Regions:
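Basic, polyanion-binding surface patches
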Residues: 1-193
């Protein structure tokens, strides 16, 4: 599993999110782990790298993020479609065995007290940048990226490899009500002469 995981330089971490994927948000606090799906996340800044993600007040993950001051974003693949949907439509508050029922496999990265979801194509460890007004009014959380990794079968040398990789590595893009798209064809602009 970890044979293909490599660190991504922090100055390139924004590239893990610029194509607009659905993400899995994970956090840990007081020995409790949780993972939820989020469709609204994006890169925010380059140096230091920052991201945003919307985490609703009713989610159990939000309490873990606020309690620990840390969260991880990960980019799930098309193989993880059902997992992503299940993690996004069930709550730890009402289903304490949510992660086990979803068969979510978690792993650890040394130096980070966070749960990371196995099988994703990218992972970003984030330290919460407290912005109480944004969090309370808009459910908008800002994180400073303190570590980033990718599965080199999908992202290497600072670039996504979707056009070369097995289609199973494509990222998910949530529309609504269990409807997703997978990232499509790569297009490159030809400079005008």
């Amino acid at each position: 599993m970890t044979d293909y995981i490599d660190s991504v330089p922090l100055e390139k971490a924004y590239r893990l999110l610029t194509h607009g994927p659905t993400v899995l948000v994970s956090s840990r606090h007081n020995g409790v782990d949780n993972v939820m799906a989020a469709a609204w996340s994006c890169a925010l800044d380059f140096a230091p790298p920052k991201v945003t993600v919307v985490i609703d007040k009713i989610t159990a993950t939000r309490a873990l993020v606020e309690g620990s001051g840390m969260f991880a974003l990960q980019v799930p693949t098309v193989v993880q479609l059902q997992l992503t949907e299940q993690l996004g439509t069930t709550s730890l508050a009402t289903e304490p065995d949510k992660l086990q029922r979803a068969q979510a496999e978690l792993f650890h990265i040394d130096g980070y007290d966070l749960p990371f979801v196995t099988g994703c194509s990218a992972w970003l460890a984030c330290r919460l940048v407290p912005e109480p007004h944004n969090q309370q009014t808009y459910d908008l959380f800002i994180g400073e990226v303190v570590g980033a990794w990718s599965d080199t079968r999908a992202f290497k040398d600072g670039h996504w490899q979707f056009e070369y990789a097995d289609p199973a590595w494509r990222s998910l893009h949530h529309v609504a009500g269990g409807h997703f798209y997978a990232i499509g064809e790569a297009l490159t602009v030809t400079p005008e002469k």
